[in-house]
Amino acid sequence: MSRPLKVVALSGGTWRPSRTLVLTQALLAELSGHLPIESHLIELGDIARPLGAALSRQELPAEIEAELQAIEQADLLIVAAPVYRGSYPGLLKHLFDLIDLNALIDTPVLLAATGGSERHALVLDHQLRPLFSFFQAVTLPIGVYATEADFADYQITSEPLKARIRLAAERAAPLFGTHLKPLLKIA
C-alpha cells in the first residue's frame, strides 16, 4: 500500500463525556497499530445543531458538507453509536440520510455501539448492519459493543472489551492486503 488508509471514525453521541467517543478513539488507536492510517474523527455532538437544522444537503454549512465528503471518501469507516431507547440516535440516521446513495459501495465499515446493558447489543446486527447494507457497504463481521460496566471514569477497564477491540482491528487489517501483527486465534 503506497499511501495511508483514510479512516474516518464517526462517534455518534452528542454528549460529553462520552463512552461512545472513548470506544471510537480506542478502535482508531488499535487500528493504527495494524495499518498505516490517516485518521479523521467526527463527533456528532460537534456538528449536531447545524446538521439537525438542514433538511437537505444543500442547506448544510461548508464545514458540515466537508465532514460528509470525508465519510464518502473514506477507505474505511468506523461508526460508533450510543443506544438510546433501543436504537441509535435519530441525528445519526439523519446524517446518513444526507450521504450519497452510491458513495459507500464496497466501503468497509467497522460497527461499534455503547449502551447501558447487554440487552442493547443486538443494535449492531439488527439496526446498524442493515443501514450500511442499504448503502452496499461491507460491514466487518466483528462488531464491538460496550456497556457501562466496561468503563470506569470514562476509561475502558474491561479486559474482554479490550480483547474485542484488538480482534476487530486485527480482522480488519487483512482486508487491506497487509497486517503488522499476527492475528488472534479464537479457540
UniProtKB/Swiss-Prot annotation:
Name listed for the protein in its UniProt record: NADH-dependent FMN reductase SfnF
GO molecular function terms listed in the Swiss-Prot or TrEMBL record: FMN reductase (NADH) activity; oxidoreductase activity, acting on NAD(P)H, quinone or similar compound as acceptor
Purpose of the protein: Involved in the dimethyl sulfide degradation pathway. Catalyzes the NADH-dependent reduction of FMN.
Gene that encodes it: sfnF
Pfam families documented for this protein: FMN_red
Protein EC: 1.5.1.42
Reactions that this protein is recorded to catalyse: FMNH2 + NAD(+) = FMN + NADH + 2 H(+)
Keywords annotated in UniProt: Flavoprotein, FMN, NAD, Oxidoreductase
UniProt-listed InterPro entries: Flavoprotein-like_sf, FMN_Rdtase-like_dom, FMN_Rdtase_MsuE-like, NAD(P)H-dep_FMN_reductase
Enzyme class: oxidoreductase
Organism per entry: Pseudomonas fluorescens (strain Pf0-1)
Family: Belongs to the SsuE family.
